[in-house]
């Protein structure tokens, strides 16, 4: 629409917006963040390594790099992110008694590096903790509807296809 709105307004009105998602991958494992219990959506659930809205005037890769730095303290460069593709999503739900309409186009990236989670600097307002999990175990949990995860199966399949055989650690 060309309209600049807040994150809250985008989700209350279902306005189409851009996001940047970064999956941190090390062999057959992916890094998941446990969202802060104070988040306005999906509180306390396991999620993508790093993700966020693209601010007005920002580009996709710059937003992905910003979110990595803000949420996890990772200073990456654009050549370290590998573009996996775009993912369109719409979710209609409710959190804290308020409608939540997530209407997004996500730019999905892979960051294939060994990350020492003990050295990460977590943005506690966003991220409670991080864990490494086996890619295929996460995929199995998501496919079975495990409510501990707020991850879309089709995005995991994008990442599986993108990294190919590198995910069987």
Please annotate each region the language model reported.
Residues 1-4, 29-34, 118-122:
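Short, well-ordered strand-loop elements centered on a beta-strand within folded domains, enriched
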Residues 37-39, 54-55, 89-91:
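Short, catalytically relevant binding-site loops at active-site mouths
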Residues 1-21:
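Acidic, metal-coordinating catalytic segment for phosphate/diphosphate chemistry
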Residues 17, 78-79, 102-104:
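Short gly/pro-enriched beta-turn/loop segments at secondary-structure junctions
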Residues 8, 44, 85-169:
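Nudix hydrolase/Nudix homology domain
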Residues 32, 49-86:
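The catalytic Nudix box helix
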Residues 19-51:
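A glycine-rich, hydrophobic loop/mini-helix early in the fold
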């Amino acid at each position: 629409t060309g309209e600049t709105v807040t994150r809250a307004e985008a989700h209350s009105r279902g306005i189409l917006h851009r996001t940047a998602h970064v999956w941190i991958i090390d062999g057959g494992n992916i890094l998941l963040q446990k969202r802060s219990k104070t988040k306005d959506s999906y509180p306390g659930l396991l999620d993508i390594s790093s993700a966020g809205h693209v601010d007005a005037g920002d580009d996709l890769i710059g937003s992905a790099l910003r979110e990595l730095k803000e949420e996890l303290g990772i200073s990456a460069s654009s050549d370290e992110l590998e573009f996996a593709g775009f993912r369109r999503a719409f979710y209609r739900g409710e959190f804290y008694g308020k409608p939540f309409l997530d209407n997004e186009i996500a730019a999905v990236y892979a960051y294939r590096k060994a990350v020492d989670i003990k050295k990460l600097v977590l943005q506690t307002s966003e991220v409670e903790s991080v864990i490494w999990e086996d890619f295929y175990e996460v995929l199995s949990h998501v496919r079975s509807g495990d409510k501990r995860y707020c991850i879309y199966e089709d995005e995991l399949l994008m990442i599986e296809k993108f990294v190919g055989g590198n995910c069987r650690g």
